[in-house]
């Protein structure tokens, strides 16, 4: 048996959320991959991998097919967890219900759990059955607004074989509550209580990345007080998540539309945290209002 530990990634999540693209991405990263492996076969397969010693990076798509799914997977994860020769993580792919419905309509495929024929019924049942597994997942990726290329990059950033297994990265994202919470957010902070630049005509069409907007947001006493409290709160939290083995922590800052206040806060937070941590900064809804106006 090989003494080298096996790096195992179990890919799961909502049907239509991008598991096929994900498993192709792992193959490009040098992982040995298998799509749609029945949960019951996973332990025997891992035994064969260990005994051969030929593959130390493995990614498996474990698909949802029945109500027995979580019971089977939970039992398997318990066994894997006891195996000191395997390091494993769960990648859970998710997307909003509306986006999943749109993808099914585009491909004209039926949902595997939609016994009544309605895609939404299948999505609702699958989301309920997968909820416990999502809670166990170390990596949750919301693919709602991701192109296949962007999803591949996300997976490469999180699972590239060149990266250390102990690496820890922060994702700081701004968003608008009116467009929904980011599904992959670990920590969510609400800045809607701050004065809104939207009501300043000269600032309305700008974003929190513009200096005059950022200055307006941060000039208020409550803004600076909240920001300093936020930094103090995160100081002990981040090392704790790192110690527990979490590879990616997503911090989401939200305001009403995701254009001004949350963008200014997220940008400043990313810059400050970047002095001590690896940080990726993104602004999900920064241009959403402008795009909506242009389409109307």
Swiss-Prot record:
Protein's job: Displays ATPase and GTPase activities.
PANTHER family assigned to the protein according to its UniProt record, in alphabetical order: RNASE ADAPTER PROTEIN RAPZ
Molecular function GO labels: ATP binding; GTP binding
Domain of life: Bacteria
Keyword ATP-binding set for record: yes
Record-stated family: Belongs to the RapZ-like family.
Protein name in the entry: Nucleotide-binding protein SMU_1306c
Amino-acid positions noted as binding GTP in the UniProt annotation, renumbered to this chain: 63-66
Keywords: ATP-binding, GTP-binding, Nucleotide-binding
Higher taxonomy: Bacteria, Bacillati, Bacillota, Bacilli, Lactobacillales
Pfam families: PapZ_C, RapZ-like_N
Residues bound to ATP: 13-20
InterPro entries found in the cross-reference section: P-loop_NTPase (IPR027417), RapZ-like (IPR005337), RapZ-like_N (IPR053930), RapZ_C (IPR053931)
């Amino acid at each position: 048996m090989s003494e080298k530990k096996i790096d195992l990634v179990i890919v799961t999540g909502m049907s239509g959320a991008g598991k096929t693209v994900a498993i192709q991405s792992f193959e490009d990263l040098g992982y040995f991959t298998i799509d749609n492996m029945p949960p019951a076969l996973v332990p025997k397969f891992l035994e064969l991998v260990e005994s051969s010693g030929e593959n130390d990076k493995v990614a498996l798509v474990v698909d949802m097919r029945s109500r027995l799914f979580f019971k089977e997977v939970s039992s398997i994860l318990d066994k894997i967890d006891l195996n000191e020769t395997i390091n494993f993580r769960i990648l859970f792919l998710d997307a909003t219900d509306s986006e999943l419905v749109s993808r099914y309509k585009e491909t004209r495929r039926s949902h595997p759990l939609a016994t009544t024929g309605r895609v939404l019924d299948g999505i609702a049942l699958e989301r309920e059955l997968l909820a416990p597994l999502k809670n166990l997942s170390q990596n949750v990726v919301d693919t709602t607004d991701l192109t296949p290329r962007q999803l591949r990059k996300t997976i490469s950033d999180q699972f590239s074989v060149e990266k250390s297994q102990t690496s820890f990265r922060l994702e700081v994202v701004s968003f608008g509550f009116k467009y929904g919470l980011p599904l992959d957010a670990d920590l969510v902070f609400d800045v809607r209580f701050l004065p809104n630049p939207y009501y300043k005509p000269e600032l309305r069409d700008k974003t929190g990345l513009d200096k005059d907007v950022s200055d307006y947001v941060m000039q208020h006493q409550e803004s600076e007080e909240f920001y300093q409290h936020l930094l103090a709160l995160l100081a002990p939290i981040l090392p704790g998540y790192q110690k527990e083995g979490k590879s990616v922590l997503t911090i989401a800052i939200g305001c009403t539309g995701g254009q001004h206040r949350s963008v200014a806060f997220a940008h400043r937070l990313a810059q400050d945290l970047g002095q001590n941590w690896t940080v990726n900064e993104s602004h999900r809804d920064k241009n959403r209002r402008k795009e909506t106006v242009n389409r109307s």
